[in-house]
Amino acid sequence: CNKFHFKGINGDFNEIIPKIEPKDLVIICTPVHLLLLAAQKSIDHGQTNILIEKPGSLYKKELNLFLKNITTQRIRIGYNRFCYPAFHKLLNICKKDEKILSCHFTFTEWIHTINFSNNLSDTYARWGISNSLHVISMAFGLIGLPKTISSYQSGMLDWHPSGSIFTGSGITENNIPFSYHANWKSSGRWGIEIMTTENSYRLIPLEKLRVCSKG
């Protein structure tokens, strides 16, 4: 805090937030199960521009209830990888110059790096929403949301009983075919590959854009 001239305040956000005067921006970065509670407390005490750490909530019902309480406030959920220059460069290319023909993406997780002490168990049991949605949302941000999709999963992990291997394919609302794969028991990484009329593009890692031209 001292390095960036911030004043640190320790304690329960239920007690601290009411004491904070309205700011230009409030960033909510708590364990997942507390995100909306802290955001609502901020709204109740006059904050109007709030950035909430992803995923906001693990449950659609909670997000919909929270949405009903928003009037004039500006509320965003922070999927920061949408701000990568590489993503916007590829998006611009595909909008202006080249038509997307198909897409493949991977969301294999480095589970050996996960800190299992930061959140409640349902955060890890819904890890696709908690974390993998970063790359999934980027892919669909490029090609559009699924119109039809076939999904398959197998295996399990102690903390993620619904599966450890995920595959699927479908067609988006823009009529672009896509496929995906993830294996949380093996090696790999996040990545997106876009095939256009002229080139194939890879966001692997997501921060960098690589191109493979025809011929």
Model-found features: residue ranges?
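Rossmann-like dinucleotide-binding domain that binds NAD(P)(H)
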Residues: 115-189
